[in-house]
Amino acid sequence: MSKKITLIVLAFFASIFLVACGKSPDVTANANGTKIGDTIKIGVNMELTGAVAAYGKAEQNGIKLAVDEINKAGGVDGKKLELVTKDNKSENAEASTSSTNLAIQSNVNAIVGPATSGAVAAASLVSQKTGVPLLTPSGTQDDLTVDAKGTKKFVFRTTFKDSYQGKVLAAYSYNNLNAKKVVLYYDNASDYAKGIADEFKREYKGQIVTEATFASGDKDYQSALTKFKDLDYDAIVMPGYYTETGIITKQARDLGIDKPILGPDGFSDAKFTELAGKKNASNVYYVAGYSTNVALSDKASGFIEAYKKAYNTDPNMFAALAYDSVYMIAEASKDAKTSVDIADNLAQLKNFVGVTGKMTIDKDHNPIKAALMVKRDNGEEVSAEAVEIEK
């Protein structure tokens, strides 16, 4: 690393420290961004290894497919898209470091990722400080795009937020499944899961028979599940990631618990079925922003065909959201000279049609779009239906 770059990086981290200590009134005050050169440089800050690599790898596939398509069609304003990829290893601290490297050393014009909320939260301050917009395909934590001062100028998302998922789970379980009594079992070590659980508790009209928690990394859930088995309830609502919920589903079915299991978009990966087992992954419902069973736009069938040709498998929600994210950045890059221009254009994006549906970015940088409830039987998605909820 050259002396000049070293000084820039040291100054950047010093400013981060001052912000953390409350010394800076506005972290975006000097966020001048990066200039767009001969190519439009898109940084990819993604969980390619580690605990939730399944999300990151699917999103990387969607990103690459979109970039290839756009470049083959001539790029944006005659400029090709160039990817610079960093593996954040499913670690929040590494996500921050990756964004710093992408923004300061690689001088990217926009960043796609990370995939998970904790990693996005860690990386978002870098975007706020440098003026390089971050668009997370799947980070759902409510406060990722806002803080005490209002909307974060350089942070956006393609998916819906946690509180919306909690509302969808509450409405669908009560109205569609007629589940008037539920067990609420969630990951207390995850802000993502806690946020969904909190909103579910606020919105659910039925009775929560019992509320229990587990922690990320746990492997044995027999004690809690044994207690649930003899209770009177209609469904289990289980906010968390597939890494734990897939195992819990297997252990629940092995104990003879056959009640419907409902969860958030953290269930939306084939790894869930691998962990649960195909037979056990039945009567399972989860929130999703995309399903191959429902065409949310005219672009859906073409995307599925192209994805299967490229990767020999169907795309999941994470791949679709990441694919849309690249096209959103491409749209926002039209006539842009800097990364700040891209951020400004993303904030004004209206009626954008992607494979996950038509969306408009609202004042808090969240998309206004449809949500789905997907049903899984024998490890396969068998149905998907739209759920209308007031945001």
Model regions and ranges:
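An alpha-beta-alpha
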Residues: 48, 152-213, 235
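Segments of small-molecule ligand-sensing domains
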Residues: 310-319, 330-381
